[in-house]
Amino acid sequence: MTRRNEKEEVPPQGKILDLFHPGIAPYAELMRIHRLLGFYLNTSPYLVGVAFSASISSTKIPIAVLLHRAMLLSIWSIFLRSAGCVWDDLIDMDLDSQISRTKSRPLPRGAVSPSNALLLTVALFACGGTVLIFLPWACTVDCLIVTFFALSYPFGKRFTDYPQITLMNIGWAVPMAMHSLGLDPLSQMTPTVCMFLFIGSVIIMIDVIYSRQDTEEDLKVGVKSMAVRFRDSIQLLSYSLLCASTGFLAMAGVLTGLGLPFFVLSVGGHFCGFWVLLRATQVGKSSGVESYAKYNMPKQAFRPRPETSCATWLLSTSRNEMGRA
């Protein structure tokens, strides 16, 4: 089979993409409209930022104002996420064409031209930027910061083992939410930094888990990432990020004087939820991590298996690391 034939991939089918006209569907796919989890991951930090702002404000903020800001920031995040996906695919087109999971995307298979993808990126950023009309000027600066790092991300995987660090820009949702409500992040600098680091470490952890499925092919193609760099200790990295993110969230609660419900529901819920996810992704073959987690997470989370317990795993990992040293 020739290389040309290998690249002739069938586009993904799904209930959401089937709703679009065949001429528009590739653009919807490029924007990841059919991947709803991505919208949640990009929108929830802004909602968390609004809730955090309301909890630390010295004056009570009307619920109508909170809902209004949450709506505007959610709209911005939706356009930001779609624009980032299109831009990332445009820059990575040559790399995606060499990886089995991504070579059927619209740009590698020729369903969308690079020029149209660039125009779509600009249009999406412009549409998202329209919400700034209804927000304080400081939010425009926040928007520019987030956009800069979103545009930088796809270049990082060519030059550094830590491109996921740029994804921490999603944590800038916290100061942007504070600015949208007229609060000064510098007045609560330490807890704000903790919330920024909390969201940033969660995003890095999720991306590392997701990137793991392409590790073998990334090595061949030359794509750099933390999943590739720490491929021999990926679980140690994941659990470390989980502990760090939990610590940052708890510290923010301590510094702002939040009550017991916050620590039980928010901090405890975060730790337990991602603990379940990490246990579900402890599989032998990295290529199956995504589907394995999706279909087997409940079973693997509560199934007692000594070989996947955290203590046993940490001991074995530490022993292996010391042996390599």
From Swiss-Prot:
GO terms for biological process, alphabetical: terpenoid biosynthetic process; ubiquinone biosynthetic process
GO CC field: mitochondrial inner membrane
UniProt-annotated location(s): Membrane
Catalytic activity: 3,5-dimethylorsellinate + (2E,6E)-farnesyl diphosphate = (3R)-3-farnesyl-6-hydroxy-2,3,5-trimethyl-4-oxocyclohexa-1,5-diene-1-carboxylate + diphosphate + H(+)
Pathways per UniProt: Secondary metabolite biosynthesis; terpenoid biosynthesis
UniProt cofactor(s): Mg(2+)
Keyword Membrane recorded: yes
GO molecular function: 4-hydroxybenzoate polyprenyltransferase activity
The organism's place on the tree of life at top rank: Eukaryota
Principal subcellular localization: membrane
Tagged with keyword Nuclease: no
Database matches in Pfam families: UbiA (PF01040)
Homology family: Belongs to the UbiA prenyltransferase family.
Protein name: Prenytransferase adrG
Protein species of origin: Penicillium rubens (strain ATCC 28089 / DSM 1075 / NRRL 1951 / Wisconsin 54-1255) (Penicillium chrysogenum)
